[in-house]
Amino acid sequence: YKIVRGAYMEKERERAKEKGYPSPICKDKATTDANFNDCLTYILHHLNDISIFIGTHNELSTYISMELMQQLNIDKTDNRVWFGQLYGMSDHISFNLAEQGYNVAKYLPFGPVKDVMPYLIRRAEENTSVAGQTSRELSLLKAERKRRKSN
């Protein structure tokens, strides 16, 4: 399973309306985060039955994942657990996970521009609102550029 937060909100709302059931979208970010972390915990406790792709740009969820894996004695290289971020976003998370030996992938959406652009805009908007991570990520990118120039 691939777990993500907020990636399919419009589709889920439309589907719920079409099928006549209440929207499954959480009322606020705190509830969304709690749901994400609960799903993460459940899946990591049931890896014999489920594999997981943890699609997150959220540092706290990444730390929670790493802590749970350690507590449950799940090896960093276990092929049933992968982390992923959108190409060009949260590179500091991807780099540090890979540096520590975790399975990491960058994903790159593709398809017709009319389908891909709204998705990318949503991702960018969501990531600028993640507790000031955008300015922090920019400073990390500048530091990395400086490091590369000096080597």
Could you describe each region identified by the protein language model?
Residues 1-151:
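Positively charged, amphipathic and often flexible ligand-engagement surfaces
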